[in-house]
C-alpha cells in the first residue's frame, strides 16, 4: 500500500470513529438508563482516544510524503507536528538515541564541532558543548503500562495486543478441537454425564473464541500499516535469557469491573450475577463471589506461584444455567515484578531529587512522571480504592522490607474486548540470594555462559535450550510453551527434544551442504518465493521458531505456500516449497534407510578383506600436519575444505571452529582427504592427547609432534610493526602471528617484542618450591589469589592458583590459555596501567600465574571507604581508558571492567587486572556472542543474545565512571534478573547539581544502541578521549605518569594486607590437597603452559 492509499485508509478510519461517536451521542440523549449511558460514555471516550491516535498517524504520513517529495527535513519526523494533539505514541522498544540523526547518526561517526582542551591529534572530535543534541530518550513505559486502561501508548498497545490475541485465538481453537473430539468419544461410549460436561466446555470455548475475534477485529481496525526503517524489533521475544518463569507469592485484590458488556437477560429478571475466575498457567487458583453491582468489598487472594509465566482473569456473567465469559485479561508475572522494581527505584530517587539526563537538559523538575504515572495510582472513581497503599509503599519500599508487603500496583486494566477491571496486586519473588536494595556498591562475581553438551545430527550442533517464550518446532510445527527444546548453535534451527533425532535435513549454514551426495538430498527442490509482508498477527519463524516481530521490517512470507520466517533466516530454509518439513524429513529418512540397507552387504564384504589401522598408531604426515594447525573458517560459508564422507558430523564441527587460512594451510587442505573412519580419528585423538576438532581453540595451534619448532624473529614482525590504523582485513592476518603461536614453544619465545639481536639468556625454571605463601588476597570460581615471596630474594608476588580438575570439568582450558596470551600482550610493552605477568608454572594438580603484587588494594575497597571526587574519578577514568585503548589496539576486548578489577599501586596509579574474560582477535568489526561479564556492567547487546564487539567495553566504562562519581550503580536490582531488566529498560538518573560534562559522557557511553555509543567507531578510544569530560587531560602526561595522583594508599609494611578484604586475608594461606588424579590426556591439555618473562 503506497502513501496515498495509506492516508486515504487512515482518513476512512477517522471518519468511521467520528460516525460511531455521533451515533453514541444520539443514543445517550435518547435513553434514561444509567447503565446504558455509562456504557455509551465509555464508547465516546474510546472513540476520541482513537481519533487522536489516528490523526497523529495521519500527520506522520503526510510528513513522510513531504519528505519523499523533497519538502521536509529527515530529522523532523521524530517531532509531533501538533504538540497539543496529545502524547505521541512511541516507536516499539525505542531506546535512547535509537536512530537519531544528530551527533552520532551519520555513517562516518564524525563529530563536526571540533575538540577542546588537550585532545589527541587526528581524533574525531566530540562536540565540546556539554549538552549538545544527543539521540532522544525513549518514552519510559513497561509492558504492564500497555495493558492499563488509561495508557498513553496506544500504538505499542495495538502491536502487543494484535500478536497476543492472535496467539490466544490459535490456542483456543486447538483447545476447542480437542474438546470436540472428547464430545464425540463420550457420545460413542454413551457417557451422558461426561458428554454434558464436555459439551459445556465446548460452548464456553466457542464464546471465548468470539470474544477474542471481537477484540482482534477492534485492534485490526485501528492498526495503521506504517513501518519506520529504524524501528528496532522487540528483542525480548527472541532472547532466551529474559523473562524466566518466576516463583513467589502473588497478592491480588479485585475491586470492581466497569463498562463491560453484560450478558443479556430477560426484561423482568434481575441483572446477571458477575464473578471472576483467576487462572495461573491454565489452572484455576481463585474465584470471587458473585455480585450484581460490579464491585467486590473484600476479595483478596494470596497465591503461591511456582515457576509460572502468566495469570489470566476471566469475567463471567451467570444469567442462566451456564456462565458466559464477557471479558478477559492476561498479565505476565515478570511484568508485575518489573513494575514493582521500578516503583522502588522511583520512590528512592523521587525522595533524593535525582532526574534523568533529558529532564536535566530541559531544566525539568525532579521525579519521573513518565513512570510514576505508569506505576498507577488509585483511579479517582475507583470504588473502595486503597489510596494509601501506593503512598505507603513509596515511603517504605526502599527500606529493605519485603517488597510484597508494602508496594502495591493499583490501577484500572483494560479487559478484552471491552471494559476495564480495577486491581491491586504485588508479587514477592522467592530469591535464593536476595541483594539488599538500599545499600551502595558491593563486590559481584562475573558470570559466564556454561558450555552445553552438543548433540550432532546431520551437521547441526544441537544444544538444550530453555525457552521462556512461546516457540514453534521447525519439524512438526507444534508449540513449545515455556519449555526446553533443542537449538542448533550454528543455524538456530529449533525443535522439540523428541524431534531432533528425526531431523534429516542438513545444517545448510555449513559450506559442505551443496557438495553432499545427491542421494542424501530430496529431489523436491522448489525454492520458496519469500517476500516482505506486514506482520500484524502471531506468526512464527519456520526455522528458528521465534515469534516474528510486528510490522514489515524483518518478516518474510512465501507467496506460494504461506511459510513465514525472519529476513535473516530465509537463506537457511530448505527448498521444500509446498511440502511440510515433517513430510520432507520422512522421505529423506526413508531414502537413507533404503540406501543403507542396500549397502550393508557390500560394506560387510569390503571390511572383511581390509586391514584396519590400530587405534594407537600415529597418523601419517598429512593428517598430523592438518591436525597440528587447525584452520579457522573464513566468514563466508563457501569454499570449505573437502569433507570426509565417513565422518560428516566431525567434518561439520571442524569447519565451524577453524581459524583463517594461511597460504601453507590452504595448500595442505588441497591434499586428497583421508578416508579413515571417525572412530579411528577419535582413537588417535585419545592416544596422542590431542583435543578433538571441537575442543581445538581458535587462537591456539598446537603441533602433535614433541619436537619444538625453532625461533624465527621474522614471524613476529607483522604483529610488532603493524600500524594502528591499518584496515581490519590487514590486521586480521597480521595479528595472529604475534601471539597465536603453538603452545609447546618455550615460554621465552612467546615474548615476541624483544629485539631479535638481543640474545636470550637461559632462565631458571620457576616452580612451587621457590615461594612461601604469606596470605590469601582473594578467591574466584576455580581457585584463589595468594600473596607469596620468593625464598631467595624475598620479593613479593601475587600468585593466581587454579585447579586443573576444575578447569577441565568446566571446559575452561582454552580460557586459561587465552588469559596467558593476554598477559603476554600486556607484557609486550610493559603497559603502565596493565598488570604484568612474571611467570607461569604448573604442578600435577594446579596451574600458577605469578603476577606483580599491587599492595594498594582495588578501587572497590577504596570507594567503600569514601566517595571519589570529580578530579579523582577523572584521573582513574583516564588511566583505565588508556588501558582499554591498548587492549583494543591489540585486538582484545576486556569484558569484565569493574572496580574490583582495578588495582591501586602505592604511587597512586591504577593497574587493570584479571584477564579471565578477555577475548582475542576482536578488531574493529569483529563480533562474538558469549554471554559473560558482571551483571551490573553487561551491555544490552550481551543480554539480548546478540553478537557484539568492542563497544561493550565502552558501556562498562560508562557504568564505571557512574559508580566512581556517584558511589552507586546506574542499574540495580535484588537479583540478576532485576539488574538485567534495569539495564534494558531504565534511564540512569543524576543529581540535579551534577556537572554537565559528566552527565554528557555518561549519557553517550550508556547508549543502548552499540553503533551509536561513544567509542563504537573505527577510531575507538579516540572518540572517548575527545569528549569534553576529559577537556583538561594531557594524555601524554597521563601515560608517562607525570600527573600527580590525587590519592596515595598507605601500608605499614611490604607484607601489609590491610587494603584487601579481611574475609580472605584471615584465611590460612595453604593449598588444599587434591585427591583426584588426572590422566595423561588431561595433563597434555596444559602442555607448554610454563613461562618466564624476560624482565622477571
From Swiss-Prot:
Annotated stretches, region: Disordered: 67-136, 356-399, 599-682, 739-761
CDD domains per record: C1_ScPKC1-like_rpt1, C1_ScPKC1-like_rpt2, C2_fungal_Pkc1p, HR1_PKC-like_2_fungi, STKc_PKC
Record-listed E.C. numbers: 2.7.11.13
Primary enzyme class: transferase
GO terms, molecular function: ATP binding; diacylglycerol-dependent serine/threonine kinase activity; protein serine kinase activity; zinc ion binding
Pfam families: C1_1, C2, HR1, Pkinase, Pkinase_C
Residue ranges, compositional bias (Pro residues): 80-90
Domain named AGC-kinase C-terminal: residues: 1031-1096
Biased composition (Basic and acidic residues): 67-79
One Gene Ontology term, aspect cellular component: cytoplasmic stress granule
Annotated positions binding ATP: 777-785, 800
Swiss-Prot/TrEMBL GO biological process terms: cellular response to starvation; fungal-type cell wall biogenesis; intracellular signal transduction; pexophagy; positive regulation of cytoplasmic mRNA processing body assembly; regulation of fungal-type cell wall organization; regulation of nuclear-transcribed mRNA poly(A) tail shortening; stress granule assembly
Annotated protein name in UniProt: Protein kinase C-like
Amino acid at each position: 500500500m503506497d502513501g496515498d492509499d495509506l492516508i486515504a485508509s487512515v482518513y476512512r478510519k477517522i471518519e468511521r470513529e467520528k460516525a460511531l461517536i455521533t451515533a453514541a451521542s444520539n443514543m445517550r440523549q435518547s435513553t434514561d438508563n444509567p447503565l446504558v449511558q455509562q456504557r455509551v460514555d465509555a464508547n465516546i471516550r474510546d472513540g476520541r482516544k482513537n481519533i487522536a491516535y489516528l490523526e497523529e498517524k495521519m500527520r506522520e504520513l503526510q510528513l513522510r510524503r513531504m519528505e519523499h517529495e523533497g519538502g521536509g527535513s529527515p530529522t523532523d519526523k521524530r517531532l509531533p507536528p501538533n504538540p497539543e494533539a496529545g502524547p505521541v505514541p512511541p516507536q516499539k522498544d525505542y531506546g535512547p538515541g535509537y536512530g537519531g540523526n544528530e551527533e552520532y547518526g551519520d555513517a562516518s561517526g564524525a563529530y563536526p564541532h571540533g575538540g577542546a582542551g588537550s585532545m589527541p591529534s587526528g581524533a574525531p572530535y566530540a562536540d565540546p558543548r556539554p549538552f549538545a543534541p544527543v539521540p532522544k530518550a525513549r518514552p519510559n513505559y513497561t509492558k504492564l503500562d500497555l495493558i492499563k486502561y488509561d495508557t498513553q501508548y496506544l500504538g505499542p498497545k495495538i502491536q502487543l495486543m494484535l500478536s497476543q490475541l492472535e496467539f490466544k485465538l490459535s490456542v483456543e481453537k486447538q483447545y476447542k478441537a480437542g474438546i470436540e473430539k472428547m464430545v464425540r468419544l463420550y457420545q460413542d461410549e454413551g457417557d451422558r454425564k461426561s458428554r454434558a460436561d464436555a459439551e459445556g466446555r465446548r460452548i464456553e470455548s466457542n464464546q471465548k473464541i468470539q470474544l477474542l475475534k471481537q477484540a482482534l477485529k477492534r485492534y485490526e481496525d485501528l492498526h495503521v500499516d506504517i513501518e519506520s526503517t529504524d524501528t528496532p524489533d522487540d528483542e525480548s521475544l527472541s532472547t532466551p535469557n529474559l523473562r524466566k518463569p518466576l516463583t513467589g507469592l502473588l497478592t491480588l485484590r479485585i475491586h470492581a469491573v466497569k463498562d463491560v458488556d453484560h450478558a443479556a437477560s430477560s426484561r423482568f429478571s434481575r441483572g446477571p450475577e458477575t464473578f471472576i475466575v483467576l487462572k495461573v498457567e491454565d489452572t484455576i487458583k481463585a474465584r470471587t463471589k458473585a455480585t450484581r453491582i460490579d464491585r467486590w468489598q473484600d476479595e483478596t487472594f494470596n497465591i503461591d506461584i511456582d515457576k509460572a509465566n502468566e495469570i489470566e482473569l476471566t469475567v463471567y456473567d451467570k444469567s442462566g444455567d451456564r456462565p458466559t465469559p464477557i471479558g478477559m485479561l492476561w498479565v505476565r508475572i515478570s511484568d508485575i515484578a518489573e513494575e514493582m522494581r521500578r516503583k522502588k527505584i522511583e520512590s528512592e530517587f523521587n525522595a533524593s531529587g535525582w532526574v534523568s539526563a533529558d529532564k536535566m537538559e530541559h531544566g525539568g523538575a525532579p521525579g519521573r512522571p513518565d513512570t510514576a504515572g505508569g506505576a498507577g495510582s488509585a483511579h479517582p472513581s475507583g470504588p473502595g480504592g486503597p489510596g494509601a497503599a501506593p503512598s505507603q509503599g513509596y515511603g517504605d519500599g526502599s527500606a529493605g522490607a519485603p517488597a510484597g508487603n508494602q508496594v502495591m500496583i493499583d490501577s484500572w486494566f483494560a479487559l478484552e474486548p471491552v471494559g476495564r477491571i480495577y486491581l491491586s496486586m504485588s508479587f514477592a519473588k522467592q530469591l535464593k540470594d536476595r541483594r539488599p536494595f538500599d545499600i551502595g556498591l558491593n563486590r559481584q562475581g562475573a558470570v559466564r555462559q556454561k558450555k552445553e553438551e552438543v548433540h550432532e545430527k546431520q551437521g547441526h550442533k544441537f544444544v538444550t535450550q530453555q525457552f521462556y517464550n512461546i516457540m514453534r518446532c521447525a519439524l512438526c510445527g507444534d508449540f513449545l510453551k515455556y519449555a526446553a527444546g533443542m537449538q542448533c548453535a550454528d543455524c538456530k534451527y529449533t525443535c522439540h527434544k523428541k524431534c531432533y533425532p528425526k531431523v534429516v535435513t542438513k545444517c545448510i549454514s555449513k559450506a559442505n551442504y551443496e557438495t553432499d551426495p545427491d542421494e542424501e538430498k530430496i529431489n523436491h527442490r522448489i525454492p520458496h518465493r519469500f517476500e516482505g509482508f506486514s506482520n500484524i498477527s502471531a506468526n512464527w519463524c519456520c526455522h528458528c521458531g521465534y515469534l516474528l516481530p510486528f510490522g514489515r521490517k524483518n518478516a518474510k512470507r512465501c507467496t506460494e505456500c504461506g511459510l513465514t520466517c525472519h529476513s535473516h533466516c530465509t537463506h537457511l530454509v530448505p527448498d521444500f516449497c509446498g511440502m511440510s518439513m515433517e513430510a520432507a524429513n520422512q522421505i529423506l529418512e526413508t531414502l537413507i534407510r533404503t540406501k543403507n540397507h542396500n549397502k550393508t552387504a557390500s560394506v560387510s564384504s569390503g571390511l572383511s578383506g581390509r586391514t584396519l589401522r590400530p587405534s594407537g598408531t600415529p597418523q601419517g604426515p598429512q593428517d598430523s600436519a592438518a591436525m597440528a594447525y587447525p584452520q579457522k573458517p573464513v566468514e563466508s560459508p563457501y569454499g570449505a575444505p573437502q569433507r570426509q564422507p565417513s565422518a560428516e558430523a566431525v567434518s561439520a564441527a571442524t569447519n565451524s571452529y577453524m581459524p583463517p587460512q594461511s597460504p601453507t594451510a590452504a595448500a595442505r587442505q588441497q591434499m586428497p582427504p583421508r578416508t579413515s573412519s571417525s572412530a579411528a580419528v577419535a582413537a588417535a585423538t585419545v592416544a596422542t592427547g590431542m583435543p578433538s576438532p571441537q575442543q581445538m581453540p581458535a587462537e591456539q595451534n598446537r603441533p602433535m609432534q614433541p619436537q619444538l619448532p625453532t625461533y624465527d624473529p621474522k614471524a613476529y614482525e607483522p604483529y610488532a610493526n603493524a600500524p594502528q590504523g591499518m584496515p581490519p582485513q590487514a590486521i586480521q592476518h597480521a595479528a595472529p602471528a604475534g601471539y597465536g603461536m603453538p603452545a609447546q614453544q618455550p615460554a621465552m619465545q612467546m615474548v615476541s617484542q624483544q629485539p631479535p639481536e638481543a640474545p636470550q639468556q637461559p632462565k631458571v625454571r620457576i616452580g612451587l618450591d621457590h615461594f612461601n605463601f604469606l596470605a590469601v588476597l582473594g578467591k574466584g570460581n576455580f581457585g584463589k589469589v595468594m600473596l607469596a615471596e620468593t625464598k631467595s630474594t624475598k620479593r613479593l608476588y601475587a600468585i593466581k592458583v587454579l585447579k586443573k580438575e576444575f578447569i577441565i570439568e568446566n571446559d575452561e582450558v582454552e580460557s586459561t590459555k587465552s588469559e596467558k596470551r593476554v598477559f603476554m600482550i600486556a607484557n609486550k610493552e610493559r603497559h603502565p596501567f596493565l598488570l604484568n605477568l612474571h611467570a607461569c608454572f604448573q604442578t600435577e594438580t594446579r596451574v600458577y600465574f605469578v603476577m606483580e603484587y599491587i599492595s594498594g588494594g582495588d578501587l572497590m575497597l577504596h570507594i567503600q571507604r569514601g566517595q571519589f571526587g570529580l578530579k579523582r574519578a577523572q584521573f582513574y577514568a583516564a588511566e583505565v581508558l588508556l588501558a582499554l585503548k591498548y587492549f583494543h589496539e591489540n585486538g582484545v576486548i576486556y569484558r569484565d571492567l569493574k572496580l574490583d578489577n582495578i588495582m591501586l599501586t602505592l604511587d597512586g596509579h591504577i593497574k587493570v587486572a584479571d584477564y579471565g574474560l578477555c577475548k582475542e582477535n576482536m578488531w574493529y568489526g569483529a563480533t562474538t556472542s558469549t554471554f559473560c561479564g558482571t551483571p551490573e556492567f553487561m551491555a544490552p547487546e550481551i543480554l539480548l543474545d546478540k553478537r557484539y564487539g568492542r563497544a561493550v567495553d565502552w558501556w562498562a566504562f560508562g557504568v564505571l565512571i557512574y559508580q566512581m562519581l556517584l558511589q552507586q550503580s546506574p542499574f540495580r536490582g535484588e537479583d540478576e534478573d532485576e539488574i538485567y531488566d534495569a539495564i534494558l529498560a531504565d534511564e540512569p538518573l543524576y543529581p540535579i547539581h551534577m556537572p554537565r560534562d559528566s552527565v554528557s559522557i555518561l549519557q553517550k557511553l550508556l547508549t543502548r544502541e552499540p553503533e551509536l555509543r561513544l567509542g563504537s567507531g573505527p577510531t575507538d578510544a579516540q572518540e572517548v578521549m575527545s569528549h569534553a569530560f576529559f577537556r583538561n587531560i594531557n594524555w601524554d602526561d597521563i601515560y608517562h605518569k607525570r600527573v600527580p595522583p590525587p590519592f596515595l594508599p598507605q601500608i605499614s609494611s611490604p607484607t601489609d594486607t590491610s587494603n584487601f578484604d579481611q574475609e580472605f586475608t584471615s584465611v590460612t594461606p595453604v593449598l588444599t590437597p587434591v585427591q583426584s588424579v588426572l590422566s595423561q590426556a588431561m595433563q597434555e591439555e596444559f602442555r607448554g603452559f610454563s613461562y618466564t618473562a624476560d624482565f622477571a
